[in-house]
Structures are given as C-alpha cells and as structure tokens.
C-alpha cells in the first residue's frame, strides 16, 4: 500500500477509532495516530487492515475546526488529497487538506462505509435484510401480542384477548368460571396492550398471597418483568424518586399496601395506563357503606384509563356485588342498582332470542316476532327466510344466524364490558374420577389425639378442626417434631404401593403443610427409593422451576411431585393425570384449586383423584360432605363458596364430634341446597353472553391462524441464522430444545435478555407448555426482538460486495442492490405501524439504471452469488465508483415512487378501517349505551394524527450490495 505522511485512513476492524492519520513510516511498518482515542497503532505496510479515506464530489466533509465543506472537486498533490468546494458558513469557495479533516468522522451511511472500504461479509447483508422483513411482518400482524406468550391456544382465551386487547383503554370484567384461565386472559391482554403501544405503565393489584404467583406467571408465560412493591420496596425507591411507583413501569402490589393513605395518593399520581384487579369479588360494596378496599379501587379506576377486573362468576356472589363491579368500570352508565335490575329484565328478551338462534333449529313464530321487534331498525326478513329455508346452503344459513347474533350482542347491555365463560359452554375438559382408599386409624394417632383433646379443651372449634384433620401433626408435636410418623401411617404404605404399581405414571401429591410434603419425600426415598421431588412455599422461584422440570422430564424424571397447599398455587401440571390428595383442605375453593392443577383445558386424559383417608375420622366426614353434599370431587362446584358460608358452622361441629345423625342431616341439607343453587344458576345462564365470551367459530379460526404461525419453518431458519451471525452458542439438548449461551466471539459485547449461564429454548409450543424451564421462541419473544434490534440498529450488513458467476452475462457487468427503509416517525401508541410499519424497499439496478427487482427476486439472486474477501471487495468498489454514483441517484428515485405508493395504500387502509369502525360504534351507541364517548373521540383524533404522521414519511438507505459478474 502506498502510504504518505498526513494521509487519512480508517481501521477495517475497529471503525470506532475514527479517522486515523499516518504519522510515521519506517521500513516495512507504518504508524497511524487515531486522535479520537489518542491511540497509536503500528501496522505492516503490506498487510495493514486499513482503508484509505477519499471523499467524492457531492459529499459533505467536516474540518477539525467544525466547519463543513460540500465537495465539488478532489485534487491529489504529493500523495495527499485536497478537497475544494463550498464553505458551510460563508457560502464561498474554500479548500480543505485531508490532514485537517475532523478525526471524529464516522462512516454511518451505507454509501460512505462502502467507499471507505468498510465492507461486511455477504451473509450479514442477507441477515440484515431478513431482520428488516421480520420486523415488518411482526408489525403488520393482526395477531400481534397473541403468539408470543407461552400459553395453550385455547379458543375462548385467545378470543377474549383479541377482542379486548385491541381496544383503546379497555374497561372490562373477566368473570370466567374457575379453571378457565382468567389470569391467562388478563396476561394476554396486558401483553397485547404493551406490544401495540396502547399501554406502557401497568398496575396489578392482587391479594397478598397471590403476588408471587402473578410475578411468576407474568414472567414465565408472558416474558413480562413485573416488580413486586411492598412497604420496604417503596421506602427503598425514595432514593430514585419521590413517588416510588414511578421507578418501575410494570408493578404488582397488594390491596393492603394501597390501604395506606400515602401509598394510595402516590399510586393515584403515577399515570398508569392500565390497572388489573384480581379477586375483585372480594371488594365489598353497599350503597351506604362501601368497604375501604372498594374505595381504593374506585379511586384508582377514576384516574386510570384502562381497567380489568378479574372476578368470580356473577352467579356466585349475587347481583348487587356484580353491579358494584360494573359500577367501577363505568359509574355514569351503572349509576343506580334498581335501574340496573330493571334494565336486566329487558336483557332476558334478547337472551331468549339468542337461544333460539344459537340452537341451530328452525325459528318458532314467537322467536321470529321477538327478533323482528328487537332489531326493528333493520329489515331482517331476508336473513329470517334464509334461516328457515331447510334446503338452503348450510354455510349461508349459519352465516345469517351469526350476523343476527352479532346484532343482538351489540344491543346486549353488558356485552362489551362483561366476559363470562362456563364449563357448560366451553369444551375440552376431562372427566374427573374419584377413588377413595379408607385406611385404619393407627393406635399411635388414637393415643395422641386423646391426649391432645384433654390438654386442649380451651381451643376454639376452628383450631380443633385443624388438629383432627391432621393427626400426624398432633403426633409429631408431642415428640418435639422429631417423630417419624410416616413409618406407621397406613396412608404412606398405600401411597408407596400405589406408586410401585403405577411406575410409568406421573403422580401429583398435595398436602396442606410443607412439613408433610418434606416428610413424604423422605418416606418415599428412604423406604423404597422412589424418585420424587418437593414443591413448597419455602423454595425460591428457580428451585421450584427445577423441581417442576424434574417432574416433567419423560425419561429420568421424578415419578411424583409432592406439593404443599401454598407452594402449588398457580402451577399447572396437565401432563400428569393422577392426583393424590394426602389430606383435605377445609375450603371448597382450595379443594377445587388442588384438582385444578390437573383439571384444566389441555388435559389429555381423565383426571384420576385418589383419596387415602383414615376411616371413622374427621377426614372421612369431610370427604363425605364434599362428595355427597357438593359433588366437589367429580364436578366443579361454583356454589361451593356460598354453601361453605351457609353450612360452615354445622360442618365444623360435625367434624369435631362423632354424631352420625347430625352428619346425615348436614349432608341432606347441603345436597338439597346445592340442587337449588344449581338450578338457579342454570336458569340464570345468559347464552348470548356465553356466545360472545367464547367466540364460537370465529375463535376457532383465530386459533387455527395462530397454530399455522407456530409451524412457520421459515421463521425458525431465520432466527437460528440470526443467532449464528451474532455468535450465540447453540447446543442441541434433544427433545426439540436448544441451549443458548453467550460466547466470547459474539459480534456485540452484550446480548440483553440472554443470561450469562444460558437459556434453554424451543420452537415447539407443546414442549414449552410441559416444561417451565424452557422458553417458547416466537417472533415476539424478547430474545428474538433484541437480536433483530442489535442487527438493524448497528452497521452490521449495511455494505456487501459479491460476485455473480454467470457466463451468459459479460464479465465485469455491474449490479447494485439497494435496500431502503420506508418509515414515519411516530409514537408507538399512535398505532401507525398497523398501516405503515418500517418497510424494506428492495431496488436492483443494472449499470444502465434499470430496476430489475420485480423480475429478479431476492432469493433467486442471492442463491447465485459468491462472497469475496474484503481486500478484493474494496478494489472492486474503487474500480466501480464512476458507475455507482449516478446509480444511487436513480435508486432513490425508484424508492421514492415506492414510498409514495406505500403511503397512499396506508392512508386508504387507515381511513377505511377507522371510518368503518367509527360509523359502526356511532350506530351502536344509539342502541347500546355501553359504547363510551372516549372511544369515539379517540378514533376521530387518531385519524387526524395518523394523517399527519403519514405526511412525514421518509426514506433511508439501509444497505447496499455491489455485485459484479465474473467468469473465473
């Protein structure tokens, strides 16, 4: 290389050093000073990884005195370059020697990097282009926010999330029956609101005992890092902000914290976009005396735009409490309880008409008259005639039914604010089978219980019941906690025999106390060497994950997982179908929670419930009350909460005595009341509301679309290639899983979201659902998003040179492939990306400036190309400069025309969609007051705002590939 003192060069391997100056030459070595960092580097003159920097006419260069020159002429004198052109400050002719160029010059623009010899490997150009295409594909997805979460594709859950998550500031009540996944629905809505920019700051209010469960659920299922706030955390946060709630965007806290006046005031002032309240049915309300908890949530609901209330079904707790929750969502709409009851009467006509449509049979004359009256502002005679015509096309008849059902729903008083699914309306649940295993009461327990009864006569009934339900605890307490009760307890003998007989089965065992769970694990291990693991509240999240993963492993994993009551909250193990209840909780809801660990949508087998109990004891009497009175083992019992409240006094008394007649009376009374409540709930079912809540055929199609995207092999290939380019270590761990590790050779110093100790990932949803320790990789996963951002926000792949070996073309023929990005700067919350996301525009020019991109696809062109080394690539660029400069100008003209078309299409799509939605909501508002004025105003303002953003759309050259034909 011909070096001279004062010449400016740039490092090919360390561009961050800036512009270097040749300051010394001695023998075969050259010294270059990089003034930006103050570093001297010594290079071999023959193999220096340096590129000479020479600008061209039209370029703008900056002097070290910080004035700039627009170059009109380039002169070389004594091996040094002198630039002539227009002075930026005076507007007059000026000259600038290359020695006086600003040493902080960076070559960020692709064409500058190309001419400066900073040329990337060819595969990086391809990865960059694919990254831009993936970002565009995600932004334009109509399912944005639904694919990424690690949840099963359950139609009613996805439907509710799709319907609610797309709204501006949604205010809804999620009131599904237990086991149908309200938490998942809320998580999907939160995830969708965050990804679409509709919400940024979210507050989740939960009972104290559920804070940890929500934290785990949001992280493991939705990749959302919430922070749990308690009083200690609030005090710590003062160092960063006077209002502790401003220190995090995503916060989980308990109602107890917000009962404090100071904390409530801070929460009210924290500018939340969305508030989620779990267990909202515990907010007590009456017109005269609302509870403190209710007032706290009410105050927040007045200042937070979006509100999600998760609650028990309205049937469970009565209409007044149901009205109280609706009042939190829209106090102007639900202002008076008597008026609400009166309005509800009118819903019955709508629901009856919906039943007639939903059953799929011909309509009676009464149903036709009712439908005609309810939809009097429309002529529905054609639809009615089509439904009644048995010879008509079945699909068309069903479509007519769907359309009329939708019309009815729009008139339903709470159709847009209340979602409630019941097991009666949702398919996919397994059968529950109870197997009882009575065991004799050991003499050791009889003696311990007799002594305890004499010593603890002062105990209240609740304490006595807790004791008689857990005789092993009484026995252990008498021996300072060191007694090995499991050596003689017949329930343990039965459990060991059961596990030995069913060695191929996964078995979940639940006990009330962590101590009991630990003792059982010791018994199984020491007596028979049975592989079991424990799961209790004293373990960390990571320890619980490892225990869950060990249990989930098909080969070499634990046969049994032994859980405590609290430790199992929020964890589901659908891959197992055998449940052993080592004892019973004194609460129907807790019993349902236990069974619900296995009895969930997605369970592929019947749930076999095994109950070993001590015969003739309180355990047997409690089992009888649950089984004969509530049928709580083999069916869900929505009225369990009410029945326990009504009969708890008699039940507790019965458990502490041996009075058979009082037990029979209790069972008869409970059974009778259970049937009454069951009939009342069935009659109170609102079929129209259920149709809206589970989505019907529309929900099934939504899930089919999501499932199809899970099978996108092109995405899998693109993501793995992305990790290859970045330098992430990938190790196949079998079972469709890959272990990712940061490597020493990564292109970037850090990869946010990729742990130092690695992460196990899979593209298989079923695998991810069965293993808590494996992340589900979709295009929405933060690791993928971060990878895309690392590439597209850096200079990686912005320049490339390749050779096309094709003897049908003259040697030396030049092609210039340009990737432009069409974009418009706008906040995420504007939703502009739905119409004009960052869009790559590919232009392929021949040397005459003809655009060949329509005829030559990227894939077919890329397959024919071969890479060249950087040294040769730099020479090819230098030799082609005269051809390239005019081609860049032509490329921009073609891209500008494409941008114009994209903008016009985006504007048409936006206007059509938003105008249609605005007109629909205005029409609905005339018949359904649940359409809020805020929604209409927001749509009108959004249209004006989006038009302004579209007017400012612009082009940016993102990447260049120079291709030359070779016959070699």
Swiss-Prot record:
MF annotations from Gene Ontology: ATP binding; DNA binding; helicase activity; hydrolase activity, acting on acid anhydrides
Residues annotated to bind ATP: 176-183
Keyword terms: Activator, ATP-binding, DNA-binding, Helicase, Hydrolase, Nucleotide-binding, Transcription, Transcription regulation
Domain named Helicase C-terminal: residues: 491-678
All copies of domain Helicase ATP-binding, residue ranges: 163-332
DEAH box (motif): residue ranges: 278-281
Name of the protein in question: RNA polymerase-associated protein RapA
Family named by the database record: Belongs to the SNF2/RAD54 helicase family. RapA subfamily.
Any one Pfam family match given in the protein's UniProt record, by short name: RapA_C
InterPro entries hit by this protein: Helicase_ATP-bd, Helicase_C-like, Helicase_RapA, P-loop_NTPase, RapA_C, SNF2-like_sf, SNF2/RAD54-like_C, SNF2_N
UniProt function note: Transcription regulator that activates transcription by stimulating RNA polymerase (RNAP) recycling in case of stress conditions such as supercoiled DNA or high salt concentrations. Probably acts by releasing the RNAP, when it is trapped or immobilized on tightly supercoiled DNA. Does not activate transcription on linear DNA. Probably not involved in DNA repair.
Assembly with partners or alone: Interacts with the RNAP. Has a higher affinity for the core RNAP than for the holoenzyme. Its ATPase activity is stimulated by binding to RNAP.
Organism: Shewanella piezotolerans (strain WP3 / JCM 13877)
HAMAP family: Helicase_RapA (MF_01821)
């Amino acid at each position: 290389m011909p070096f001279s003192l004062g010449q400016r060069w740039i490092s090919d391997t360390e561009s961050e050093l800036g512009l270097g100056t040749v300051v010394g030459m001695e023998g075969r070595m050259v010294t270059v000073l990089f003034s930006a960092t103050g570093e001297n580097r010594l290079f071999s003159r023959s193999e220096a990884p340096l590129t000479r920097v020479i600008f061209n006419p039209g370029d703008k260069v900056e002097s070290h005195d910080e004035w700039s020159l627009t170059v009109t002429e380039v002169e070389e004198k004594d091996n040094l370059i002198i630039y002539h052109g227009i002075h930026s400050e005076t507007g007059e002719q000026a000259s600038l020697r290359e020695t006086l160029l600003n040493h902080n010059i960076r070559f960020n623009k692709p064409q500058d990097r190309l001419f400066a010899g900073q040329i990337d490997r060819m595969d990086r150009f391809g990865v960059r282009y694919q990254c831009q295409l993936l970002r565009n594909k995600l932004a334009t997805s109509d399912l944005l926010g639904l694919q990424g979460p690690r949840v099963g594709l359950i139609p009613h859950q996805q439907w509710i999330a799709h319907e609610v998550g797309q709204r501006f500031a949604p205010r809804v009540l999620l009131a599904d029956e237990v086991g149908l996944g309200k938490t998942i629905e809320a998580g999907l809505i939160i995830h969708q609101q965050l990804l679409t920019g509709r919400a940024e700051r979210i507050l989740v209010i939960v009972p104290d005992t559920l804070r940890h469960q929500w934290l785990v659920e949001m992280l493991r299922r939705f990749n959302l890092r919430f922070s749990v706030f308690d009083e200690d955390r609030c005090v710590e946060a003062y160092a960063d902000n006077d209002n502790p709630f401003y220190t995090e965007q995503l916060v989980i806290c308990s109602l107890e914290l917000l009962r404090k006046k100071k904390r409530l005031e801070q929460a009210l002032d924290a500018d939340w976009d969305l508030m989620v309240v779990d267990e909202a049915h515990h907010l007590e309300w009456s017109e005269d005396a609302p509870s403190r908890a209710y007032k706290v949530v009410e105050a927040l609901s007045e200042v937070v735009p979006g509100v999600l209330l998760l609650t028990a079904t309205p049937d469970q707790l009565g209409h007044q409490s149901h009205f109280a929750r609706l009042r939190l969502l829209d106090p102007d709409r639900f202002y008076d309880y008597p008026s609400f009851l009166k309005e509800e009467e009118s819903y019955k006509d709508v629901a009856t008409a919906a039943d007639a449509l939903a059953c799929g049979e011909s309509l009676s004359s009464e149903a036709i008259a009712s439908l005609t009256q309810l939809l009097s502002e429309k002529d529905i005679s054609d639809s009615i005639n089509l439904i009644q015509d048995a010879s008509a096309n079945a699909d068309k008849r069903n479509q007519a039914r769907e359309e009329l059902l939708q019309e009815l729903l729009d008139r339903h008083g709470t159709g847009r604010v209340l979602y409630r699914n019941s097991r009666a309306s949702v398919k996919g649940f397994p059968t529950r089978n109870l197997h009882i295993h009575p065991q004799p009461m050991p003499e050791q327990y009889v003696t311990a219980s007799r002594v305890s009864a004499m010593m603890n006569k002062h105990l209240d009934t609740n304490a006595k019941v807790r004791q008689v339900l857990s005789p092993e605890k009484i026995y252990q307490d008498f021996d300072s906690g060191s007694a090995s009760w499991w050596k003689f307890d017949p329930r343990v003998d039965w459990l060991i025999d059961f596990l030995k007989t069913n060695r191929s089965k996964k078995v979940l065992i639940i006990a009330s106390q962590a101590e009991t769970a630990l003792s059982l694990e010791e018994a199984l291990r020491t007596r028979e060497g049975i592989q079991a693991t424990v799961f209790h509240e004293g373990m960390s999240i990571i320890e619980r994950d490892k225990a869950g993963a060990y249990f989930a492993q098909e080969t070499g994993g634990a046969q049994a997982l032994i859980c405590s009551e609290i430790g199992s909250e929020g964890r589901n193990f659908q891959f197992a179908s055998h449940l052993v209840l080592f004892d019973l909780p004194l609460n129907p809801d807790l019993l349902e929670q236990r069974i619900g660990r296995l009895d969930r949508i997605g369970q592929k087998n019947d749930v076999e419930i095994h109950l070993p109990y001590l015969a003739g004891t309180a355990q047997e009497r409690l089992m009888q009350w649950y089984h004969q009175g509530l049928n709580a083992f083999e069916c869900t019992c929505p009225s369990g909460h009410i029945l326990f409240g009504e009969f708890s006094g008699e039940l507790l008394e019965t458990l502490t005595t041996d009075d058979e007649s009082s037990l029979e009376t209790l069972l008869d009374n409970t059974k009778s009341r259970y049937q009454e409540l069951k009939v009342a709930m069935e009659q109170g079912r609102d079929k129209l509301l259920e149709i809206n809540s589970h989505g019907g055929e529309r929900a099934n199609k939504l899930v089919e679309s999501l499932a199809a995207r899970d099978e996108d092999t092109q995405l899998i290939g693109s993501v793995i290639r992305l990790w290859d380019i970045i330098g992430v270590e990938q190790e196949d761990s079998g079972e469709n899983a890959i272990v990712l590790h940061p490597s020493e050779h990564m292109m970037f110093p850090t990869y946010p979201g990729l742990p130092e100790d690695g992460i196990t990932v899979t593209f298989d949803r079923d695998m991810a659902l069965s293993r808590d320790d494996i992340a589900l990789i979709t295009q929405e996963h933060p690791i993928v998003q971060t990878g895309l951002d690392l590439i597209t926000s850096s200079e990686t792949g912005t320049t490339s040179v390749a050779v096309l070996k094709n003897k049908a073309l003259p040697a030396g023929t030049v092609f210039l492939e340009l990737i432009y990005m069409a974009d418009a700067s706008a906040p995420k919350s504007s939703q502009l990306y739905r119409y004009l996301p960052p869009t790559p525009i590919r232009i392929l020019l021949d040397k005459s400036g003809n655009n060949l991109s329509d005829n030559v696809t990227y894939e077919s062109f890329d397959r024919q190309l071969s890479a060249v080394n950087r040294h040769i690539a730099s020479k090819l660029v230098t030799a082609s400069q005269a051809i390239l400069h005019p081609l860049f100008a032509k490329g921009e003209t073609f891209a500008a025309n494409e941008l114009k078309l994209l903008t016009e299409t985006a504007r048409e799509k936006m206007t059509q969609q938003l105008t249609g939605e605005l007109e629909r909501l205005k029409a609905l508002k005339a018949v359904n007051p649940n359409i809020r004025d805020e929604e209409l105003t927001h749509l009108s303002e959004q249209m004006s705002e989006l038009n302004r953003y579209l007017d400012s759309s612009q082009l940016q050259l993102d990447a260049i590939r120079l291709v030359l034909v070779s016959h070699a």
